[in-house]
Structure formats: structure tokens, C-alpha cells
Amino acid sequence: MSEWCFKYHVEIWAYCLMPNHIHLIAVPQTKEGLNLAIGEAHRRYTRRINFRKGWRGHLWQGRFASFIMEENYLLACTRYIELNPVRASLVNKPEDWPWSSAKAHISGKNCILVNTKPLLDIVNNPWKTFLSCDVGHSEIETFRKHERTGRPLGDGSFIKRLEHTLNRKLRLQKPGPKR
């Protein structure tokens, strides 16, 4: 993953590899970078594991899904991601899950995949303290909804700026023919 993120100019700020899916906070520097990096990493990893295990087919549930997120949601989403193995009862503490950015954030040191600085610069408390509170059920549902729909997550002015920049409608439209 780190090889392809480097090649296609994508920074990973947080991640958690779960048994059947992965969560990332990825910041692409180019328009196509995210699709190219994730797509190539997924293909290579799937091919390697399938060959090693004698398997065929997909390793992950569902397709690659992404959504643009306003900075206001960044910390809650990071908390959601790094606490995922705790919520799934795989570990008691997030730093005990070896396939997550939690340990890198707690130590304050980058690992081969994660750039810890952007998020550590925002959080004023030690990272362990930051992870001591889980996100609320409504926030979890919000993240899952935007992951399913691919619609941007942000307030009205954020969505409006995106619509202007991309020259397309992003807000939910009423069903039926458009006038």
C-alpha cells in the first residue's frame, strides 16, 4: 500500500485493517491518485494472498468506497477508524491492534504507511487520551451513510463550495424528473 500511495501521491493519515475490510483517511494530491493507489494496492494484495493460500476471488467485502469530508469531521472519523477493533471486540485497547495507525499516533512516529503529523498537530491532548472516548452512535451512522452513498460530508457552505468547484450537484435531489 505504501509503495502505491507514494507513487500516486496519496498521504495516509489514519487506517485500520479489519478482518474483512479496511478504513483509511487518505489525502490524495492529484485527481486520480486515490483510485490508482488503492486500486493497484488492492489488486496486488489480493493476487498475492490468493496465490499464497490457493484461493480465488475477492478478499474484501464490497467495493472501494470513498467520500470527501470537511475538516470538522476529521477527528471524529479518525477516532471511529482507530477504535474499530475495540468496538468489534478484537482487542481491549486500540494500540494493541497491529494493523492500525493508533500505535503510530500514540508514539508520535510515522510508520511506513502513515504520516502522523497532520492529525497530531490538530489534537492538543496525548493521543491515548484522544482515543479514550468513542464516537457516538449517530456519528457512526453518519460515516456509514456517507461511505455507502459517496456523498460529501460537511455543512451547507462546504457542499456549496464543492458544487461550485466541481460544477455539479452534490446535494440530495428530490426524486422524479428535473425541471
Map each language-model feature to its residues.
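Broad gene-expression machinery/nucleic-acid interaction feature
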Residues: H21
